[in-house]
Amino acid sequence: MQKVVKLNNIKIGNDLPFVLITGPCQIEGKDHALFMAEKLVKLTSKLEIPFIYKSSFDKANRTSVHGIRGVGIEKGLDILSKVKSEFDCPIVTDVHSESQCIETAEVADILQIPAFLCRQTDLLQAAAKTGKIVKVKKGQFLAPWDMKNVQTKLETFGVKDILFTERGACFGYNNLVSDMRSLAIMAELNVPVVFDATHSVQQPGGLGGSTGGERKYVELLAKAATSVGIAGMYMEVHQDPDNAPSDGPCMMKLDNLESILIKLKKYDKITKEK
């Protein structure tokens, strides 16, 4: 029987209708966060898709030292708290160090471990101590079966509810490729699997001082992943991605999200028909 992670009234499982994890890459301010959350809550309510809001208070692994990192943990968590209380939606955000975990867990329902940090034992242990759901993004350098070691660490530290995320694998320099077998392989670990459709089209460092991306392939990869069968779809969105402070080339345009989600619901239903 496939593992199901429960979060409030949301059930996250590989055999269940997919959950949407979405929001802007980084927190840009209170007004922008509330604007985005309102749009996303209305859309997901209309389409009857379970929704978890995602945005980062710090982009600690920017390509360049001059890249905009975000509003910081104190201001960021305050903004996420306002989003959570105003729209009654669960929150997921990244943690980059052990010291951030307890404070972040006061607001976030899910702690996300970035792909570059997925093997950091001390960080995994600190996240585990919060008692929250821990969502780990598979490193671009890891085979999907190597996530068994991450699972063992988390379970050893007492984590009951784990989510794994596929976000592409290194394919030469400045490029990623999505191996859809990874979704099935990680699901065999009895962990709900999420597909990150926007970071999978990244071209890391591809613009020299920043990361490039091929937004035009987001929908294609999202359809492929949904056809395999996933617990969640992770897509970062922005009303004006070309002018976003980070990951603009990868993020979906907010105006295009509805049409894509309608298609993904159809793929998801067919894939999971008994």
Swiss-Prot record:
This enzyme catalyses: D-arabinose 5-phosphate + phosphoenolpyruvate + H2O = 3-deoxy-alpha-D-manno-2-octulosonate-8-phosphate + phosphate
EC number, UniProt record: 2.5.1.55
- InterPro entries reported for this sequence: Aldolase_TIM, DAHP1/KDSA, KDO8P_synthase
GO BP, one annotated term: keto-3-deoxy-D-manno-octulosonic acid biosynthetic process
GO MF, one annotated term: 3-deoxy-8-phosphooctulonate synthase activity
Q: Looking at the UniProt record for this protein, which Gene Ontology cellular component terms does it annotate, in alphabetical order?
A: cytoplasm
Instruction: Give the SUPFAM superfamilies listed for this entry.
Output: Aldolase
User: Where found?
Assistant: Cytoplasm
Pathway assignment reads: Carbohydrate biosynthesis; 3-deoxy-D-manno-octulosonate biosynthesis; 3-deoxy-D-manno-octulosonate from D-ribulose 5-phosphate: step 2/3; Bacterial outer membrane biogenesis; lipopolysaccharide biosynthesis
Give a Pfam family name: DAHP_synth_1
Which UniProt keyword terms apply here?
Cytoplasm, Lipopolysaccharide biosynthesis, Transferase
Major subcellular site: cytoplasm
Family designation: Belongs to the KdsA family.
The protein's name is 2-dehydro-3-deoxyphosphooctonate aldolase
